[in-house]
Each structure stands twice: as C-alpha cells, then as structure tokens.
C-alpha cells in the first residue's frame, strides 16, 4: 500500500503543478459514496490511501477541498446510485451538482449568475 500511496501522491503533485503552470486554480472534490459501500473500506484504509494524500496536497498548495464522501444526503439514499454506491445516476448527479455548485457559490469561488445557476440544474 505504501508504494501505491507514494504513486498517488506523486501523480497528484504532477497534476497540481500542471494546473499551476497553466495558471488554472484547481480544487479537489471527493464525491459521495453510499454507506453500504463505505462499510467495505476501513476508516484507516480510506485515510491512508485517499484522504491523507489529498488533505496534504490541499494544505501545502492552498487548494480548496470539498469532501462529500460521507455526506448524509447521499450516503443513505441508494436510489441515487446506478451501481450500488460508487457512481451517481442521473438524479444523484443532478442533486450532487446542485449541492456542489451551492457550496462553490457560498464560498465565493464562483458567482451565482444567469449563465451558471444552481436553479438551472
């Protein structure tokens, strides 16, 4: 697992460097996962393989992180998924994007305007 984590960290750092070179402002988004699927992974595994790498890069590079992994609006509503918990279906995606765009507007990352509006989703 250590090698995998190191590879993930290296790849993420390359992606961040690429964005910075292009003058882009990246942000990290961890999408929701159903509670049934979450039970398949220990908290220690999720922390070590995913969260520690993303949290570290977010902190070191001052990149906003939106972690919806255990978002209750999504975790227990299994009809939002098309595959049991990893992939949101059409309705789940629409609900997630409304929530996510609302957070981006609330945090001042994007403006709520007529071109990009939560209400249009």
Residue ranges and their predicted role:
Residues 1-71:
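Conserved, well-ordered alpha-helix/loop/beta-strand core segments that scaffold catalytic motifs
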Residues 35, 79, 86:
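Flexible, active-site-adjacent loop/turn segments at secondary-structure boundaries
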Residues 39-43, 81, 120:
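Short amphipathic alpha-helical patches
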Residues 63-65, 78, 93:
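Generic intrinsically disordered, low-complexity segments enriched for polar/acidic and small residues
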Residues 67-74, 106-112:
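Noncatalytic linker/hinge segments flanking ATPase motor cores
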Residues 73-83:
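Short helix/strand-capping connector loops at secondary-structure junctions
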Residues 82-121:
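Histidine-centered active-site loop/cap adjacent to the catalytic His
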């Amino acid at each position: 697992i250590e090698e995998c984590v190191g590879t993930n960290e290296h790849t993420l750092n390359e992606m961040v460097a690429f964005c910075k070179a292009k003058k882009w402002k990246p942000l990290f988004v961890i999408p929701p996962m159903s509670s049934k699927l979450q039970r398949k992974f220990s908290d220690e595994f999720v922390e070590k393989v995913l969260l520690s790498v993303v949290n570290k890069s977010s902190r070191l590079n001052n990149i906003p992180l939106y972690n919806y992994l255990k978002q209750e609006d999504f975790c227990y509503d299994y009809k939002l998924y098309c595959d049991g918990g990893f992939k949101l279906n059409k309705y789940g995606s629409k609900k997630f994007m409304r929530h996510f765009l609302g957070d981006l507007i609330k945090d001042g990352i994007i403006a709520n305007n007529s071109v990009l509006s939560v209400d249009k989703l």
